Regions:
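Membrane-embedded segments
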Residues: 21, 26-122
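Short loop/turn segments at strand-loop or loop-helix junctions that form parts
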Residues: 28, 83-88, 241-246, 282-285
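Secreted/periplasmic serine-hydrolase-like ester/acetyl group-modifying domain
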Residues: 85, 101-235
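Well-ordered, non-membrane alpha-helical segments in soluble/globular domains
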Residues: 64-67, 218-226, 257-268
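C-terminal regions of proteins
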Residues: 251-316
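N-terminal secretory targeting modules
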Residues: 1-21
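Active-site segments of SGNH/GDSL-like serine hydrolases
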Residues: 229-256
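Short alpha-helical segments and helix-capping/turn motifs at coil-helix boundaries
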Residues: 7-13, 63-71, 223-225
Length: 316
């Protein structure tokens, strides 16, 4: 699958629209892209026979709302909806990319809430949405990416992948039938070369991780999240999922990222207990049983690490 010609949110929204034979559907960000029932190292095998991975880069609560509405309308065979909790999940507007399908979001939100409730929520967050739109328009990375696409003579397209070794990758990243991703051979090699002692890195890019120091969660976002879970529970069994960060990220517990993970994991378990939802995994790699060599970078675990997630299972 070559880059740029398709917006991945369109791809995964369409995957959600077509009924599959999967008994589990997983919602999350790039941290879950390696979760798979199609590989040798299967993930969530005790909970799922076959899963559909709807992991999207930079996925936020707004993405979950859009995809969940499509799931409710189209997925009849699934039994479990597994929602990945990130350090930024219980906030609104932590990434601008969901605005790609803002119209779908507005429709989904109206279906979730009564008219009076929806008017209140819409008024509360409209201003920040407009700010995000403006920021996205002037974002230098977005601008450069768009410019390169316009000037490129390459034939960016989606094509069927030939047989290849999943461990080594192939010329481009590959979307597997279950929605999980195999990185390109070039990316896999780069990751092997770039592995470093992350404990030496004292300052982390909080913006890239969707974390705002001190703002671990928002009341309004949590209310929307709870409403979403209750809506899904009418048709499915809902499970929360937490994936670990690299052990070296945890070496300095005064980092805002560590404080965020501790507070959010605590809040996620608190919400899960109230809603009678089970929780799989943890931000802490020691609890899951993951080692440094089982990570691709600071926040993305390999399929080997992710195959251990059910080592931490909290029933509610």
């Amino acid at each position: 699958m070559k880059n740029y010609v398709w917006n991945e949110r369109d791809i995964y929204l369409n995957l959600a629209k077509y009924e599959s034979d999967s008994d589990c559907i997983v919602l999350g960000s790039s941290q879950i892209k390696q979760i798979s029932s199609y590989r040798k190292k299967r993930s969530l095998s005790s909970s799922c026979n076959q899963l559909l991975n709807l992991g999207i880069n930079g996925a936020v609560l707004e993405d979950y709302i859009v995809l969940s509405q499509s799931i409710l309308e189209n997925q009849k065979k699934a039994k479990n909806i597994i929602i990945a909790i990130n350090a930024w999940t219980f906030n609104l507007n932590r990434d601008a990319r969901w605005l790609h399908y803002k119209d779908d979001y507005d429709i989904a939100l109206k279906k979730m809430f009564s008219e009076n409730d929806n008017n209140y929520i819409t008024n509360e967050i409209t201003a920040s949405y407009q700010t995000l739109l403006i920021k996205n328009l002037i974002n230098i990375k977005y601008f450069i990416s768009s410019l390169n696409l316009i000037n490129s003579k390459k034939n960016y397209s989606i094509e069927m992948a030939k047989d290849f070794n999943f461990e080594l990758g192939t010329t481009h990243k590959v979307l597997l039938p279950d929605g999980s991703i195999i990185s390109s051979a070039e990316t896999i090699e780069e990751r092997k070369k770039n592995k470093k002692d992350l404990s030496k890195k004292r300052e982390w890019n909080m913006q890239n991780w969707g974390i705002v120091p001190g703002v671990w969660y928002e009341k309004n976002a949590i209310n929307i999240f709870i409403k979403l879970v209750n809506q899904l529970k009418k048709n499915f069994n809902v499970i929360f999922l937490i994936t670990p960060y690299h052990p070296d990220v945890w070496s300095n517990e005064e980092q805002p990222s560590i404080k965020a993970m501790k507070n959010v994991e605590l809040k996620a378990n608190e919400i899960a207990k109230i809603l009678n939802v089970d929780v799989i995994g943890s931000f802490n790699p020691e609890k899951v049983g993951c080692y440094s060599n089982e990570f691709m970078d600071e926040i993305h675990a390999t399929d080997l690490c992710l195959s251990k997630l059910e080592n931490v299972y909290v029933s509610n």
